[in-house]
Every structure is written in structure tokens, then in C-alpha cells.
Amino acid sequence: MKLDNLSPIKKGKVRDLYQLGENILIVSSDRISAFDVNSVTEIDGKGRSLNSLSAWWFKKTGNVFPNHFLEVLNSSKMLVKKAERIDVEWVMRGYLYGSMHRDYAKGNRELYGYKLPNGLNLAEKLPEVMLTPTTKADVGHDMPLTKKQAIDSRLVTQEEWRILEEASFKLYA
């Protein structure tokens, strides 16, 4: 499928979206974005891998929570139903790692509304599985969110939070 006559309706960090009739075409690129930083370097084949992995997970989890996936069109393109994006990243954690470990190492013991005990080490299993949501920033850093912040800032309603929190824990399990 050629995109010569189409302009993206949105250019993301690694994916571009195009209106295709009533649906959306998602094109996964070879661009690199890690830890909220976009690189000028690309990785050949990354878009194909990302597209394939995303399609696999959409198919695998669609019975737990409905999603927008329709079909893979080719190695880097998929067709999805048009949907409204919720600007929250629903990050589940079972282990102390990444940005949570960084904040914990700085002495922060209350993160994302959870109180963590002293003495945890990098990659150690957390006392419980934790939902650690962040903003979904188009540019720059995603910021940690609590349930109250997400609802107060109207990123989600209380009912949307309940449904998505429940689905996140089901998907993690």
C-alpha cells in the first residue's frame, strides 16, 4: 500500500496515523524513542517487528479487553477501528525497575499512591503488583499520575478509571 497521496493525521514518536475511510492506518516506523528521547538514528526492521509484536498482543488479549485492532495489512502497517485515545499509559509493575527504581533510589517511598518499604533492591519483587500510570506525552517526558490526578485533570472519568484499572490487572495476571 502506497502512502503517496495521504498525509498523516498524527505523527507519533514511532508510529504515524492516517485516515483510511472510517478506519485508521497505523504505520510503524524504524524510528527510535527510548526513555522519552527520540533518536536521529533508525533501526532497519524495527517497524516490522513493532507492528508484528503489537498485532500478536492485540489478538492475544482481545478476549480480556476489547481493542481497536482489525488486521495487519503488511509488515509495517495495520488497520484499526477509529477510537478515542486515552492519554494515560497504564504501566503495571511487579518488580522494582526503571523509573520507579530511580525514584526509589532517591529516597522516595510513596510512588503512584503506593507506600513502599525501605530496603528494596533493583529488580526485587514488589510487595504487590502495582498500577503506575503516567501521562501519555506526545513530546517530552511522560509524568507519573495518581488516580486522583487523572480524574481531576479529566484524562479519564471515575468509571473509565475503574474499568481500565480492572482490565490492567487482568492483563498483567
Predicted region positions:
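A long amphipathic alpha-helix within ATP-dependent nucleotide-binding catalytic cores
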Residues: 153-173
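Active-site loop/lid in soluble adenylation, ligation, and acyl-transfer enzymes
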Residues: 1-136
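A short mid-domain helix/strand-loop element embedded in enzyme catalytic domains
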Residues: 126-156
